Amino acid sequence: KASSSAPKGWTHHGSRFTFHRGSM
């Protein structure tokens, strides 16, 4: 629902969660 509900490194995009790697 909210991006704050997603774990650290994950972003709520649309109706799915996408994992974003800051280092790589």
Swiss-Prot record:
Residues 1-24 are annotated as: Disordered. Expressed by the venom gland. The keyword Secreted applies. Its main location: secreted. Keywords: Lectin, Myotoxin, Secreted, Toxin. It is found in: Secreted. GO terms for molecular function: carbohydrate binding; toxin activity. Residues 13-24 form the C-type lectin domain. It comes from the Eukaryota. Disulfide bonds: none annotated. GO terms for cellular component: extracellular region. Able to depolarize frog skeletal muscle fibers, but has no effects on squid giant axons. Tetrodotoxin is able to partially antagonize the depolarization. Induces myonecrosis. This is Myotoxin TmC4-47.2. The lineage of its organism: Eukaryota, Metazoa, Chordata, Craniata, Vertebrata.
